Amino acid sequence: MSLILASTSAIRRQLLDSAGVDYVAVKPDVDEAALKARLTDPTEIASELAAAKARSVPGDDWVIGSDSVVSVAGRLFDKPRDRAEAAEHLRFFSAKPMRLTSAVALARGGRVDWSHADSATLQVRSLSDKFIETYLDAEWPEVGYTVGVFRLEARGVQLFDRIDGDHFTILGMPLIPLLGALRERGLLQS
């Protein structure tokens, strides 16, 4: 029996690798836009997307699905389509609190057996246009693959005045609860 990560996210692979988890990564087959179109609550969206990704891989292997959602001033944000939209997002985020919700689900045989969601609040500092351009010069296109236009493990940490919440949740996966769930199922040593 294998453990599968239904994700193409580099940071989620890095988190599992660093924790010593053996897994195989596959691209999930999920219509994210359709799911997001019928939901409005960030926690519900992240949880449903994580569950859908975990259910998307057929067979008897355990499958991890995970997703993150960013909301600022009541508005949900997707990954930017291009650098210009990334700059627009950053200008909108400036001097506002950002809520980042990450969820993770564990499924087997197309059925979710366990899930967990967590949120963090990140206070975006006041960002000048010059900073935004310099930041994107250094971080684009990598931040184009993230919903908040930042990588906390890189220059993205400079966007914030204060961060309240779990580090792993902010990186994109509530890792500590997931590791506990894997141990409970005998997928990691206890």
Question: Can you say where each PLM-predicted feature lies in the sequence?
Answer:
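N-terminal beta1-alpha1 ligand-phosphate binding loop
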Residues: 1-21
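Anionic-ligand binding patches
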Residues: 2-3, 39-190
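Cofactor-binding loop segments of dinucleotide-utilizing enzymes, especially the Rossmann-like FAD-
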Residues: 8, 28, 109
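Flexible, glycine-rich phosphate/dinucleotide-binding loops
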Residues: 12, 32-34, 113
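A short beta-strand-loop structural module common to alpha/beta enzyme folds
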Residues: 24-34
